[in-house]
Curated annotation (Swiss-Prot):
HAMAP family: HSP90. Gene3D superfamilies: 3.30.230.80, 3.40.50.11260, Heat shock protein 90, C-terminal domain (1.20.120.790), Histidine kinase-like ATPase, C-terminal domain (3.30.565.10). Molecular chaperone. Has ATPase activity. Homodimer. It comes from Mycolicibacterium gilvum (strain PYR-GCK). Residues 1-353 are annotated as: A. Belongs to the heat shock protein 90 family. This is Chaperone protein HtpG. One of its GO terms (cellular component) is cytoplasm. SMART domains: HATPase_c (SM00387).
Length: 651
């Protein structure tokens, strides 16, 4: 029978799509191989289903597979499967028409049929992946024969608006069942990201990256050369067929069927890591949104965890096909240390299959994954404290970012967080443990925020709390300065900074007993306080007696609702305008320096020397909390003058 050859035009939409595909849709030209393997996998799934449903279909399904064939001399690459194949009409309808892969229709049939044993893994719903071949090929040939039919069909196009299609008589049996796609490759061009797709190692790399977990074996014949055994002899060349993909989708297997060693090896593969995972999280969701996830919490923080371009470490698969690495839509930024994969069964994607739509499903999956990771951290905290301590040391700082960004899980994040405190040099505490230890009469959770533990321990702000035996949380991460401004309580207990507002640590009985003494001191210091308020008016908004100092002469505090200097510096560093706020200078009425300053002011009134002493008092308070002097040279001059006179008096 003479071949029935036609030359047809692509539909207008298909022509536009071809141009879009070649020039802009795919961000990576390597994606073409993923698309061809996905289509081949789809064809194998369809054949398996058809053989299951149609007992009259006489086909062999014992060795379903995908084959990659390269010809270096001809510069061709062929992807071949022995799946369902296509008829001539289907080729015209599916290849010459925009986005009609047939898989979406088949999935609808599956929903209706509910064939429990068919277990299809169909991935071709995107319908346009075949056209990606034209990114790397000048000409594409497709040869296909549908299972159960004798005629085959050959399709060919250069991607320039038209294609030829012909019927191939199967009388000679030269066309096997299934589909083969042959790409006549464009010249290699590294600048245009056109690689050598006839290279065995490049093909291995792409299959490993994109299609490692496809359910069907992806095979390729490879040459192996053995050096000559004797001098002057010839090397031996053998050809062996190798399977390039692992086909091990661990997330699809029940957890009790997977060993810890297998999980560890998979973690190292997917995370490009050298350590072992601290925790493994396997989950499956069924119902409205079906997906499987295999996530890992690493043992060590990556070096780039806090870099500006740090990315989420979760990969997205759809029907075991790699879609996207570092999928930030599946995990919030504060969980960017989590590694693993999510395999969705029916996720809506946009045209490139590389950029997810912000749809209801992806948001639902993200919420569930987030809650699962946080619940795992909570389990570690309660049941595996050693692992939790390792986790917190490595990732606690980044986890606390969620206190600012994730209001839905804020309570959980507070409970799984740990903080250093004055109770122990080594053991951090949770907020729940802190509250449990609060003595009778304490109604607030006290904290100090600063740059280092040592700086905070030496801070004048802690003196009264140490004297009373109250535990104080020591917050030293930059994010701490921010979240404490937005979270005001835990378990009904207010969070109170030791450096903000007024501190009242005495019981009612103590306050009554000390009231007369307090009033007397207020009178004694009224004049010097008024004078200091005037002299230091450029630096402070108020001067008052302190109830938080026991050893230091003075300290600076912020209004209850004011912005701390550290937080103001952070805002300014990020480009946000922050007005300069004057703070409050508190004096220790029992300190010799403050008492001497009061007596000197009473005896000789205000003078320049006393004003210099006032500036030194303010400067020492600023330095004691780790602050920076506004005019270090003036402070040094005043200090040198006082030291000179002191040495002179002693000599």
């Amino acid at each position: 029978m003479a071949p029935h050859v036609e030359q047809l035009e692509f539909q207008a939409e298909a022509r536009q799509l071809l141009d879009l595909m070649i020039h802009s849709v795919y961000s990576n030209k390597d994606s073409f191989l993923r698309e061809l393997i996905s289509n081949a996998s789809d064809a194998l799934d369809k054949l398996r289903l058809e053989a299951f449903r149609n007992k009259d279909l006489d086909v062999d399904t014992s060795d379903l597979h995908i084959e990659i064939v390269v010809d270096k001399e001809a510069r061709t690459l062929t992807v071949r499967d022995n799946g369902i194949g296509m008829s001539r009409d289907e080729v015209v309808r599916l290849i010459g028409t925009l986005a009609k892969s047939g898989t979406a229709e088949l999935r609808q049939q599956l929903r209706e049929a509910k064939d429990a044993n068919a277990n299809e893994e169909l991935i071709g719903q995107f319908g346009i992946g075949f056209y990606a071949s034209f990114m790397v090929a000048d000409r594409v040939e497709l040869l296909t024969r549908k299972a159960g039919e004798s005629e085959a069909t050959r399709w060919e196009s250069t991607g320039e608006g038209s294609y030829t299609i012909e019927t191939v008589d199967q009388a000679g049996g030269e066309v096997p069942q299934g589909t083969s796609v042959t790409l006549h490759l464009k010249p290699e061009d590294r600048e245009d990201e056109l690689h050598d797709y006839t290279s065995e190692w490049k093909i291995r790399e792409l299959v490993k990256q994109y299609s490692d977990f496809i359910a069907w074996p992806v095979r390729m014949d490879v040459e192996r050369r053995t050096p000559a055994s004797e001098e002057g002899g010839e090397e031996t060349v053998t050809v062996e067929t190798q399977t390039l993909n692992s086909m091990k989708a661990l997330w699809a297997r029940p957890r009790d069927e997977v060993s810890d060693e297998e999980y560890t090896e998979f973690y190292k593969h997917v995370a490009h890591a050298w350590d072992e995972p601290l925790e493994t999280i396997a989950m499956r969701a069924e119902g409205t949104f079906e997906y499987q996830a295999l996530l890992f919490i690493p043992s060590h923080a990556p070096f780039d965890l806090f870099q500006q371009n740090a990315t989420v470490g979760v990969q997205l698969y759809v029907k075991r096909v790699f879609i996207m690495g570092d999928c930030d839509q599946l995990m919030p930024p504060y969980l960017r240390f989590v590694k693993g994969v999510v395999d969705a069964q029916d996720m809506s994607l946009n045209v490139s299959r590389e950029i997810l739509q912000q749809d209801r499903q992806i948001r639902a999956i993200r919420r569930r994954l987030t809650k699962k990771v946080l619940s795992t951290i909570a389990e570690m905290q309660a049941e595996r404290p050693e692992k939790y301590r390792t986790f917190w040391t490595q990732f606690g700082r980044v986890l606390k970012e969620g206190l600012l960004s994730d209001t839905d899980n804020q309570e959980t994040l507070l409970r799984v967080s740990s903080f250093a405190s004055t109770r122990s040099d080594d053991e951090p505490t949770t907020l729940a443990e802190y509250v449990e230890r609060m003595p009778e009469g304490q109604t607030q959770i006290f904290y100090a925020a600063g740059e280092s533990r040592q700086q905070l321990l030496n801070s004048p702000h802690l003196e009264a709390f140490k004297a009373k035996g109250y535990e104080v949380l020591l917050l030293t991460d930059p994010v701490d300065e921010v979240w404490v401004e937005s979270i005001h309580e835990f378990d009904g207990k207010p969070l109170q900074s030791v450096a903000k507002g007024e501190v009242d640590l005495d019981s009612e009985a103590d306050k009554e007993a000390q009231e007369t003494e307090r009033q007397q001191r207020e009178k004694e210091f009224a004049d010097v306080i008024a004078w200091l308020t005037e002299v230091l008016g450029d630096h402070v908004k108020e001067v008052r007696l302190s109830t938080r100092l026991t050893d230091s002469p003075a300290c600076l505090i912020t209004d209850t609702f004011g912005i701390t200097p550290a937080l103001a510096r952070m805002y300014r560093a990020s480009g946000q305008p922050v007005p300069v706020e004057k703070r409050i200078l508190e004096l220790n009425p029992t300190h010799p320096l403050v008492v001497g300053l009061r007596e000197a002011h009473e005896s000789r009134g205000a003078d320049d020397e006393l004003a210099g002493t006032a500036e030194l008092l303010y400067g020492t308070a600023l330095l004691a909390e780790g602050g920076a002097l506004e005019d270090p040279a003036r402070f040094a001059g005043l200090l040198a003058d006082r030291l000179t006179r002191m040495v002179g008096e002693q000599s």
